[in-house]
Amino acid sequence: ITNEYGQSSDPDIYVAGDLRTIHYNPTNAPEYIPLATNAVRQGTLAGINIFGNQWPEMGAQGTSAIALFGHTLAMTGLTYQRALNAGIDADYVLFEDNYRPEFMPSTTKITSIMVYEKKSLRILGAQFYSKHDVSQSANLIQNQNTLKDLAFVDMLFQPYYGRPFNFINLAAQAGLRKIGLL
């Protein structure tokens, strides 16, 4: 375990990569998540911080994705079951829609699952599945976003790239409808 700057219990020793834990944002606790993205960020920040502890880590969500048989599966943070196992009062919304407007020459379905904390509506995790590359959408929980934040957040709209309400907006709106806030 290190501090937020990568220092071990000896302030002259910095630790990065698969040798250490990282602050896991969904649970606000240290967790062992051996991913290359974490190792690269930790190593870079440790190199910077050796010269004066100036840049804390932002934590991680355990975001990953894979392409299988022409489909993208992406995930970040907690699944619903992992949230319950962690003792979090959570719920989820499952939402499916096209990623582009129907009038476009081609479109494809995106299935989204958003896991959220019931009281605060904070997004704890998400999973996405589509033929369309949805891998970067899994980064939506880094900033402690809530269903309310994501329901109407400004997203790029141009019919080639998406709908007036992005699939993330629509999934968050579905979650708010599920709990009677929309």
Would you name each region that the model predicts?
Residues 5-6, 65, 104:
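Short secondary-structure boundary/capping segments
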Residues 71-76, 86-182:
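Flexible, glycine-rich terminal cap/loop adjacent to redox cofactors
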Residues 21, 29-34, 48-77, 150-158:
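Active-site-proximal substrate-binding core of FAD-dependent oxidoreductases
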Residues 1-45, 137-143:
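FAD-site-proximal beta/loop scaffold in flavoenzymes
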Residues 8, 41-42, 59-61, 109:
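Short gly/pro-enriched beta-turn/loop segments at secondary-structure junctions
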